[in-house]
Regions:
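Residue-level signal for secondary-structure boundary elements
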Residues: 33, 82-85, 89, 147, ...
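Generic alpha-helical structural element
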Residues: 62, 128, 132-135, 174, ...
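Juxtamembrane/interface alpha-helical elements of multi-pass membrane proteins
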Residues: 104-169
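Short Lys/Arg-enriched alpha/beta "domain-start" segment
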Residues: 1-118, 125
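Charged, alpha-helix-enriched surfaces in structured cytosolic catalytic cores
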Residues: 68, 130, 134, 180
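Membrane-associated alpha-helical segments
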Residues: 154-263, 268
Length: 270
């Protein structure tokens, strides 16, 4: 009979400080550190019980079914950058099942993955993909918020022919958000990178690619990139409008100063 485990992925913060967690977190009284990488800490509490902490704000848990205990563990990982004001922290966690059966052939299914054995390396491949998936959910929500803000600005332009009901600062914040999301996906989330083991083990690479396909990471990334291109183009247009408005204001100020200078000159002559 196949042994079944569940793995859960939670987005809890904008980022997690791995150094502080490694040195200070009370979670160390329950779990022992099994592996340390640049953007990842892997803890274990026994056979097939893992806790992975990613620098980009995601925690994955395997082999623990008690949701109350999971919630308590997440509270112990409080070192990092909190969500910004106005952000919704309730990103839905993702879950996926692992069926371990020495007699079965390994495969990636819709709601579970079949493995002959569950090694740490195989678990980390699944954990990596799920962590990226739940982080993409967060990015998708942020991009949707940014698109909504841009839609409101464009509606103002369409209705009034000028920017009404908004200010330069809010527009610049919207522009900056698109760049921040690109940076997050490519650098911190490392969406385009493959784990080192996939370069050394063909079976690991096949498993990783099948998992990415199942969670539609590549398709979702392309969809996000298309939306970000739209946001980028809209942002450039808005920056041009802001630049033109500032230039117009500057011209008016110069004209007023010249007029004042002429008035003082006339007063002096009189």
């Amino acid at each position: 009979m196949a042994a079944k485990l569940s793995i859960y992925a939670y987005y809890i913060k904008n980022s997690l400080n791995l150094t502080q967690i490694e040195q200070n977190s009370p979670v160390l009284s329950i779990f022992s550190l099994a592996r340390k990488e640049r953007n990842l800490l892997v803890f274990t509490a026994g056979e097939n019980q893992y806790l992975c902490v990613y620098a980009f704000g995601v925690v994955t848990v395997c082999g623990i079914e008690d949701k109350t205990r999971i919630g308590e563990l997440l509270k112990l990982l409080s070192y990092g950058e909190d969500l910004e004001e106005g952000q919704d922290p309730k990103i839905q966690p993702e879950d996926y099942a692992i069926a371990v059966d020495k007699e079965a052939s390994e495969s990636v299914e819709f709601d579970h993955v079949k493995l002959k054995t569950l090694t740490l390396e195989k678990f980390l491949l699944l954990s990596h993909v799920m962590a990226q998936s739940v982080a993409i959910d967060f990015v998708e929500r942020r991009i949707t918020d940014t698109q909504q803000a841009l839609e409101n600005i464009h509606s103002s332009l369409a209705s009034h022919g000028k920017l009404v009901g908004t200010n330069t600062r809010s527009i610049l914040k919207t522009v900056g958000m698109s760049g921040k999301m690109v940076y997050f996906m490519v650098t911190r989330l490392s969406l385009l990178d493959k784990p080192d083991i996939t370069w050394e083990d063909k079976d690991a690479e096949v498993l990783f690619l099948n998992l990415r396909k199942m969670f539609e990471l590549d398709d979702r990334f392309e969809a996000l990139r298309f939306k970000l291109e739209f946001i980028k183009d809209s942002s450039e247009t808005l920056m041009d409008i802001i630049g033109a408005r500032r230039a117009q204001v500057l011209e008016i100020i110069i004209i007023v100063l010249i007029a004042i200078e002429i008035i003082f000159a006339l007063i002096g002559i009189m």
